[in-house]
Swiss-Prot record:
The lineage of its organism: Eukaryota, Fungi, Dikarya, Ascomycota, Pezizomycotina. It comes from Emericella nidulans (strain FGSC A4 / ATCC 38163 / CBS 112.46 / NRRL 194 / M139) (Aspergillus nidulans). Binds 1 heme b (iron(II)-protoporphyrin IX) group per monomer. Belongs to the peroxidase family. Peroxidase/catalase subfamily. Homodimer or homotetramer. This is Catalase-peroxidase. Heme b binds at H258. Induction: Induced by transcription factor stuA upon carbon starvation and during early sexual development. InterPro entries: Catalase_peroxidase, Haem_peroxidase, Haem_peroxidase_sf, Peroxidases_AS, Peroxidases_heam-ligand_BS.
């Protein structure tokens, strides 16, 4: 070691936050950090900032004009190919939205996460740091009226339109986040472009939708750089399918995107410096500084591939399909040594991006040829070749779906270019077209609910089962629509219980009786009635425990139909394990309590909200199969803090019931008599130090009143997670039911 070399790494910096941390000592520790993200502490905007209002005050078409002008305003520090940045901005928007996956709804462009690591430093995102910097003067001009999340997508739309393509529309409304989202599982590989972990069992690991660490979809050279278009098609079908795209949408997206621009592989990637998150401070957040000749323009290195697909790379055309089928293709390599294909025996006629005197032969990627040599893709490709209007429509729709899949329901769509057509992947619910129930109706309906012959615990469990399908990642699920009565939700194992079908039948009967009795157009939806049943049942449970509470309720939900429900798509919301209902068990890789934290994060819960909900759900006997797991009370159905009192009782000793370590028996320390049974999702609130600290608040002698108040608040939050109609219109005037 030289005299000037430091023997310490920055990880061991002797300042606050340095040195070994808990995750270093205990890497398997429960990841509660994902429940503490994106809060007001990290947000620099004013408290109460309303992005929807800000966006709607924007000079939207002025912004679009500025973006269109930028497309051809080539900058010396990063020159535009063919004098037009369109291809670059299409790629930027695609790679922002394209991280979405259907299994957990995470990823996507809805939070502007491409600005942060790891996405800003993925190998597949080389040079997109430059695209975002090109946008900065426009973002600076319009400030908080346009989020980065919206701007990245809108720039892609304007790029398409500026090159002659008619888009399907655009919806704003994506609010920015201000830190990297730590909840997303991007894979277990420790090397960029690795895939040894995600294919450990022979198939792509769930919930991943990319074939390699750091790629958006697949390796364009072919699987593990095997330039076989047929094998590549298998990877394409899996990855695009996991991003919610069918074969037609997949073909349209690949061909449509590759109608424009070019790839960049002027030299080997060894010439590139560190990625943005690892680069020197002097680069100010830019990365991949190139040492290859000028490093820009014709010398740019991005993917290592060097392909220009069409003769008019800044104009919409059908040339991609024309060339795909017109020419025979032979394998070659780019200047960087990457596998790609060139048209055999064809005189060069493709323009050079910077020198009009130079021409190139047509070239394609391995994954482009998949659209010709995969039998199913070929049928679609030939149809698009022969019917350019069908291709244009399919690409417009697929691009809109790609860029809006994680925005949420249509009520969140903002701006003057929102398309009027309702699409099934938007999980539509009928518009509210009738007067809603008032306070007197609520009081009447609550009495009918509690006198229905169904226990209040079953009614509350029904409401929880409906509302808790929500996931904040892509804003799907929730109580609105009452889809719990429809396929596929009614057939999920967690919902295939007699008490649920009986509760729904009773509520449907009450709904019919009420609606039939009206002399006006006033109606109550089943979706509203399910949530109202939860409120009425919760008030009764609290009252039976000696607490007089009022549970807030806002009517206005409507009932979706089976025709408005994509069964295959909704099946992605079915839980593998759900600790809130003591359903399912962990695996050697994902423990039961890990599944619980994952579910809590999708419900936008904080650690205290998670804790209080578990305590209340257990004493209300919310277990899906009505087992006694975690029901630490002698008075089930009453809203008490008994779960915490008995969990923290040092007179109880816990031991595994068997060698699975999933079920535990709590016995009296002195007599050995069994008192309770618990799952891992129960005992974690006594074993994990941070969760135990919260549990102690609720388990104290003065904790029950706070517990009841906090449980009611947490339920109100969960039951309204999907009420974006209230949040967007400012009509969140909750009707307080009469006591």
């Amino acid at each position: 070691m030289g005299s000037n070399e430091c023997p310490y790494s920055r990880q061991n910096a002797n300042i606050g936050g340095g040195g070994q941390n808990n995750r270093d000592w205990w890497p398997d520790d429960l990841k509660l950090n994902i429940l503490r993200q994106h809060n007001s502490v990290s947000n620099p905007l004013d408290k109460g900032f309303d992005y929807t209002a800000a966006f709607n005050s924007l000079d939207y078409f002025g912004l679009k004009r500025d973006l269109e002008a930028l497309m051809t305003d080539s900058q010396d520090w990063w020159p535009a190919d063919f004098g037009h940045y369109g291809g670059l901005f299409i790629r930027m928007a695609w790679h922002s939205a394209g991280t979405y996956r259907v299994f957990d709804g995470r990823g996507g462009g809805g939070q502007g996460q491409q600005r942060f690591a790891p996405l800003n430093s993925w190998p597949d995102n080389v040079s997109l740091d430059k695209a975002r910097r090109l946008l900065w003067p426009i973002k600076q001009k319009y400030g908080s009226k346009i989020s980065w999340a919206d701007l990245l997508i809108l720039a892609g739309n304007v790029a398409l339109e500026s090159m002659g393509f008619k888009t399907f529309g655009f919806a704003g409304g994506r609010s920015d986040t201000w830190e990297a989202d730590q909840s997303v599982f991007w894979g277990g590989e420790k090397e960029w472009l690795g895939n040894d972990v995600r294919y450990l069992n022979g198939e792509l690991d769930n919930p991943l939708a990319a074939s390699h660490m750091g790629l958006i979809y697949v390796n364009p050279e072919g699987p593990n750089k095997n330039p076989d278009p047929v094998l590549a098609a298998k990877d394409i079908r899996i990855t695009f399918g996991r991003m919610a795209m069918n074969d037609e949408e997949t073909v349209a997206l690949i061909a449509g995107g590759h109608t424009f621009g070019k790839t960049h592989g002027a030299g080997p990637a060894t010439h590139l410096g560190k990625e943005p998150h690892g680069a020197g401070i002097e680069l100010q957040g830019l990365g991949w500084e190139s040492g290859f000749e000028s490093g820009t323009g014709r010398h740019a290195i991005t993917s290592g591939l060097e392909v220009i697909w069409t003769k008019t790379p800044t104009k919409w055309s059908n040339q991609f399909f024309e060339y795909l089928f017109k020419y025979d293709w032979e394998l070659t390599k780019s200047p960087a040594g990457a596998h790609q294909y060139v048209a055999k025996g064809v005189e060069p006629f493709i323009p050079d991006p910077f020198d009009p005197s130079i021409k190139h032969p047509p070239r394609m990627l391995t994954t482009d040829l998949s659209l010709r040599y995969d039998p199913e893709y070929e049928k679609i490709s030939r149809r698009f070749l022969e019917n350019p209007d069908q291709f244009a429509d399919a690409f417009a729709r697929a691009w809109f779906k790609l860029t809006h899949r994680d925005v949420g329901p249509r009520v969140l769509y903002q701006g003057p270019e929102v398309p009027s057509e309702v699409l099934i992947w938007q999980d539509p619910v009928p518009p509210l077209d009738h007067p809603v129930i008032d306070n007197d109706d609520i009081a009447t309906l609550k009495k009918a609910i509690l006198n229905s012959g169904i226990s209040h615990t079953d009614l509350f469990s029904t409401a929880w089962a409906s509302a808790s399908t929500f996931r904040g990642s892509d804003k799907r699920g929730g109580a609105n629509g009452a889809r719990i009565r429809l396929s596929p939700q009614k057939n999920w194992k967690v919902n295939s219980q007699p008490w649920l079908s009986e509760s729904l039948a009773a509520l449907e009967k009450i709904q019919k009786q009420f609606n039939d009795a009206q002399s006006t157009d006033k109606r109550v939806s089943l979706a509203d009635l399910i949530v109202l049943a939860g409120a009425a049942s919760l008030e009764k449970a609290a009252r039976d425990a000696g607490h007089n509470v009022s549970v807030s309720f806002t009517p206005g939900r409507t009932d979706a139909t089976q025709e408005q429900t994509d069964v295959d798509s909704f099946n992605n919301l079915e839980p593998i394990a759900d600790g809130f209902r003591n359903y399912g068990r962990g695996t050697p890789r994902v423990l039961t309590e890990d599944f619980l934290i994952d579910k809590a994060q999708l419900l936008n819960l904080s650690p205290p909200e998670l804790t209080v909900l578990i305590g209340g759900l257990r004493v209300l006997n919310n277990n899906y199969d009505r087992s006694n797991l975690g029901v630490f009370t002698k008075r089930p159905g009453q809203l008490t803090n008994d779960f915490f009192v008995n969990l923290l009782d040092m007179g109880v000793q816990w031991k595994p019931a068997d060698d699975t370590n999933e079920i535990f028996i709590g016995s009296d320390r002195k007599t050995g008599q069994a008192r309770w049974k618990a799952s891992r999702a129960d005992l974690v609130f006594g074993s994990h130090a941070e969760l135990r600290a919260i549990s102690e608040v609720y388990g104290s002698s003065d904790g029950e009143a706070k517990f009841v108040k906090d449980f009611v608040a947490a339920w109100e939050k969960v039951s309204n997670l999907d009420r974006f109609d209230l949040k967007q219109t400012g009509l969140a005037q909750r009707i307080k039911p009469q006591l």
